[in-house]
């Protein structure tokens, strides 16, 4: 799979206020997500390393207690098991990259197909 077209994928409701399309490789998961204005993603952690690249909007991240507002062109790197949360200050479009594969997202896709 050398190319990904996020426009042709099935749009999934990932969490309340977060929807998008997913793609997986052997070792990674990629998500092109729309985050509704005001969406509050409560603090959590996971085994995955994550990079969140903001394509549109303003997204406030808290990673290990360090807070930063990300805007278009900015990204956040979240190490494995790091506690983090986010709040959409506007509607946002983001590209999230996770490694290893998000098996919970794979299961969600199977459940909804």
PLM ranges: what are they?
Residues 34-35, 46-61:
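Short, conserved beta-strand element in jelly-roll/cupin
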Residues 65-80:
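Short acidic-glycine-tyrosine-enriched beta hairpin
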Residues 16, 31-45:
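Conserved short histidine dyad/triad with adjacent acidic residue
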Residues 55-56, 71-72, 90:
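A cytosolic small-molecule/anion-sensing beta-strand core signal
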Residues 1-27, 111-113:
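A short, N-terminal "cap"/entry segment at the start of jelly-roll beta-barrel domains
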Residues 80-104:
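Ligand-binding loop in jelly-roll beta-barrel domains
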